[in-house]
Amino acid sequence: MAGHSKWANIKFRKGVQDAKRGKIFTKLIREITVAARMGGGDESSNPRLRDAVKKALNANMKRDTIDNAVKRGVGGADGEAMIAMRYEGYGPGGVAILVDCLSDNKNRTVSEVRHAFSKHGGNLGTDGSVSYLFTNQGEILMASNQPEDKVMEIAIDAGASDVAVEDSQVEIITPVEAYHTVLNALQDAGLEVEQSHLTMRAQTLVPISDETAESLIKLIDMLEDLDDVQEVYSNAEFSEKILESMN
């Protein structure tokens, strides 16, 4: 649990910091537009849009900017025709990596992703080469100063598949189809949710050396800095020393 949740916390904080510098607003707007185009502009019936809007609000994006992105998506004809793509590969130490992208130019995107892998000791794989090592799930993180029995009861009753408590945090894992039901149940009960998102969660984390971790982090950072890249997932288990250094 710790490897997953601590890495999620670090990525969340990094995302907020990047948003303040304007680095990820373009990606968030793109995700909102595509989600609205694919599933309509009603957040209540479009889980992907609801999740994208939540990310944007967490990054302090103005509601007018979000609404305009939704309108562009629903309008359909305006703007670029974005395509969702997923690339799979191996990083330093044989770590499995998934890269989710939204792009209007597949050739540009694959070239940039391949270059990042090559530069930092990895290699791009074929479809299916590592995706079987991950499961699409919902992840909800809460502070553990809330009544644990109540959190567990509500989460499990609403469809959560696992609830774990460690240190100062409660981590709730859900099937994709139960994610919003569980999240709404917790919030309706007046419980405070620190983070929530849909993610590709590694089924098993692979321990790596600190030296390998440093190379892997450079690769992940380079991938995440690409305009077309939306999310990067890996099955690496980082040491406490590395996690602390990233805080």
Curated annotation (Swiss-Prot):
SUPFAM superfamilies: YebC-like
Keywords of the record: Cytoplasm, DNA-binding, Transcription, Transcription regulation
InterPro entries: Integrase-like_N (IPR017856), TACO1_YebC-like_2nd/3rd_dom (IPR048300), TACO1_YebC_N (IPR049083), Transcrip_reg_TACO1-like (IPR002876), Transcrip_reg_TACO1-like_dom3 (IPR026564), YebC-like (IPR029072)
Disulfide bridge map: none
GO cellular component terms attached to this protein's record: cytosol
Family the entry assigns: Belongs to the TACO1 family.
PANTHER family linked: TRANSCRIPTIONAL REGULATORY PROTEIN YEBC-RELATED, TRANSLATIONAL ACTIVATOR OF CYTOCHROME C OXIDASE 1
HAMAP family the UniProt entry points to: Transcrip_reg_TACO1
Protein name: Probable transcriptional regulatory protein LPC_0711
Organism, as annotated: Legionella pneumophila (strain Corby)
